[in-house]
Each structure stands twice: as C-alpha cells, then as structure tokens.
Amino acid sequence: ADDDNNTGADHKRTLHWNAVGTEVLSPATLTRFGVEYNIVDGLQHSPYRNVYAGGSIVPERHPDHRERRDAFLKLSQYFENRSSLRFNYRLYQDDWGILSHEAGTRLSQYVAPGLFASYDYRYYTQTAAYFQSDAYTSVGGIDGYLTGDYRMAALASHLFGFSLDMDLGVMAADVPALRRLGVRIDFERYFNSNNYSANILETGLDFRF
C-alpha cells in the first residue's frame, strides 16, 4: 500500500435477517417474495482507494455503520406452448441515501427437441449516497466522508440478453460421439448512464458421464 493509505487492522461485522415465502397461485403460476435487513458495522471503504479532494489526494472514508433493507417479488408463469415468463422486482434502501429499483423479465421458449431459447431484460436505477460527489471542495468531504467507489454514484442501466441451450444428445441422437454433450451460448448487451457499455459473450460445453 502507499504511505497515504496505510491503515491499521480493522473489522466488519454484519447481522442479517430475512424472510422468504413461496405461493402456488395455480398449476401454472408460482410467486416468491421476501424481505431482507442487514446491519453492517466496521470498515466499509477500501484502504487502497484514494479520492481527489481540495487539491489533494486523500484516502476515501465511508461511515462505519450502515443499515440495508430490501424487498423482492418473483413471478413465474408457464404456458401450454412449452414456454415460460418470469418477472422479478427488487426495492433496496439504506441509510447512506441509496434507493434502488431493479426490474427484470425472462422469456424461455422450447424451439425444437433439445433446443431452448431465452430472452432477458433488466433495468436498474439508483440514487447516490449522500456523501458522494464528483468534486470534493475540501479534504473533509461531506460530513467527514469521501468516496471514490463508483457504486456510490447515481446510476441507471439496461441489460438485454439472449441464450441458447442445445442438448446434442437429443438433437443428434444418431451420432454416438454427441450423445453426452450439451452446448450453451449466452450473449448480453449492457449499457448505463455513466457512459459504460459492454458486449458479453459466453459459451459452455457440458459433458455428461
């Protein structure tokens, strides 16, 4: 570590509570819901991250206490055409001033024997922590706190995804070499309000013994 961000030993302690319920609304409809509550005490910033403040480079400082709360709802609906639609929503709030909403959906569709396709969308938005700033005017920050963590800033993001699952043992049952193989292809397009975007491609090969 640099001389300006050396810190002594510290700790972090988290107390976690949650309650989750599942309800079958019909033979084709399932819902899941829950709440979570976390109390975090101790070191909650990075001792290796610095911030430009008041013309100087200083270590970031976060509050030592944080209370985090969230609630979620998930709904799954299955259809007779061998497809399913899933919806999820999560609300989050903490005493650092961050309030976030996350909503997403997934459509899964049977295409042909051994072939399944999925389409995904997720939207996320959050407010900034009360002590976050793009330009601190003094080394004291805001109420004594400073952050260089991008996760403390306001944000809105979108994610689109598409995936294919192929069971080659079903699709090419007459080819002995493929009977134990499966292939998965995932593509995601992500972009946010902080001028960051990414294209993510993942592939996987499954071999069944």
Model-inferred region functions:
Residues A1-A9, L15-W17, T105, Q109-Q132:
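Long amphipathic alpha-helical scaffold regions
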Residues Y78-L85:
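Gram-negative outer-membrane beta-barrel transporters
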